[in-house]
Amino acid sequence: MALNLQGKQAIVAEVKEVAKGALSAVVADSRGVTVDKMTELRKAGREAGVHMQVVRNTLLSRAVEGTPFECLKDTFVGPTLIAFSSEHPGAAARLFKAFAKDNAKFEVKAAAFEGELIPAAQIDRLATLPTYEEAIARLMGTMKEAAAGKLVRTLAALRDQKEAEAA
């Protein structure tokens, strides 16, 4: 169905608004993936705080102008599915990586984070970013480990000192 000018402007405005509030974006080619699989992907995306949309490349190019995702323009070739992560920068990358593992025809093209283009081969960099809770848990674990190690070293030094005095 052909879009009139107002429809195209509405799509560009919607995508531009989502892009302004997004932390990262991932672009993929979903040719050959069945509708029920795409529906599952969209459902998982909604649960993860990821906005997904298939948009014409010309409209998408206009929508990302002036955003940190302008670096993705060269990847807008063929059918383009774009996903914007608004809650966690690695959410869309993690979702697409897992989906591509189960669906051979689904191809991740590239991602963008803080204005930097991340090629598909390096998408793991973005997908493995810890969530806020995971980062806090790792930090707390490191801090507890350091405190326990210091206690052990202090007790060992105290033991050595008492042994030296007794000898």
UniProtKB/Swiss-Prot annotation:
Keywords: Ribonucleoprotein, Ribosomal protein, RNA-binding, rRNA-binding
A matching Pfam family: Ribosomal_L10
Superkingdom: Bacteria
InterPro entries tied to this protein: Ribosomal_uL10, Ribosomal_uL10-like_sf, Ribosomal_uL10_bac, Ribosomal_uL10_bac_type, Ribosomal_uL10_CS_bac
A cellular component term, taken from the record's GO annotations: large ribosomal subunit
One GO term of the biological process aspect: translation
Record text on subunit structure and interactions: Part of the ribosomal stalk of the 50S ribosomal subunit. The N-terminus interacts with L11 and the large rRNA to form the base of the stalk. The C-terminus forms an elongated spine to which L12 dimers bind in a sequential fashion forming a multimeric L10(L12)X complex.
Name of the protein this chain belongs to: Large ribosomal subunit protein uL10
Native source species: Yersinia enterocolitica serotype O:8 / biotype 1B (strain NCTC 13174 / 8081)
Gene name of the encoded protein: rplJ
